[in-house]
Amino acid sequence: MPEGIAAAEQALANGDLKEAEELGRAALRDDDSLAARLTLAQALAWQGRGRDADVVLAEVDPAALSEPELMAWALPTAANQFWMLNEPERATAFLRTTRGRVTSAPAGATLDALLGTFAMNAGSPQRAMELASQVLASPDADQQAIGWAAAAAALCNARMGTFADVDELAGRAIAAGHPGLLRFTSGFGQTTALVMSGELDRAESLARELVDAAQEQQPSHAIGQLLLADVLIARGDIDASVPVLEAAAVALAPTGYSWGPLAWMLLAQALAQLGRVSDAGRMLARAESKHGLKSMLFAPELALARAWTSAARRDGPGAINAAREAARAAERGGQSAVAVRALIDAVRLGDIRAAEFIERLGVDGVIGRMALDYARAFTAGDASGLAASSAAFGDIGMRGVAVDAAAQAESARGG
């Protein structure tokens, strides 16, 4: 491999996207090869500059490529279409067409891994798990396929309420060594599983490690901040979450990543919980305008943003209805753990019917059991039960829920 391309690829692997772009352009000037073109396109795409990447990729004639070359070109082309150009249907159709053209088993496994990642982001984690499981069980899957499949499986498992395999899957994704943002996909799975297991200190510690490991001014740093803010919101550290989310949202806004809409969703939730009604409304509007098929995995978070914004506007029934819709959206997508978190918020907002929903979900683990106890106590107007739930949530560091449950206990006593 020419020295210039190797240097650009190393910068890409290190997450230094600006340097990768500069080195990639220099390499392309010296050697108009497919390798140079692909390295430059990836550096541009990972900065959120999808149109620029598309121009670089469009210069390639796929009919003139061998199967390995076709794969090397098709994967970043599809990824760019899905995220950066916001054309998920086109990207999925393109990948399926490419899948029909390749003949080798390793190539098929790699395409299936990316199709699974697309399915996850499009709100179909169960389909994503089917594809990921096939890839991870295949002796033909290369490290790139394993990285994509394992990272997607880690996040899907966590959001679906299956926590036991999350760390192992994240480890497989890391060991695959594929560059990019996969560490944050699997990391979100890990922090989600830790929160749902009541280990909020470990969740926050991991999120901070991911932030610290990423270079500032890069999308990876902003995504790490997003994961940290999600844990802070679960803790009830809303004041601390807002500046983190504001920085992440601004950094991710120019990109096409699915993380971008999630940043606005979480920021709207946080601002609403602080009573900043106007600001929350503006952030909710941004979240709604940016949300689409490529971020459908996070539809429950958008509904929760509506719930908390309604609560800030003193629309109690609207808040409860939106929180219920968050839980229903999560359940429809098989995201049971996300549904439980939504229903905890529903109880905080005054929903007396959440207990039967939580019971139906059957999510095992610390938070699943605590959520059911809390919802049952609220439905029954059981002051002692609410006080016990407040103490239990406080003990694991979910202070926001603890404060609300304590207030509900006081109200149940007639205080």
Model feature map: region roles:
Residues 1-2, 415:
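Accessible peptide chain termini
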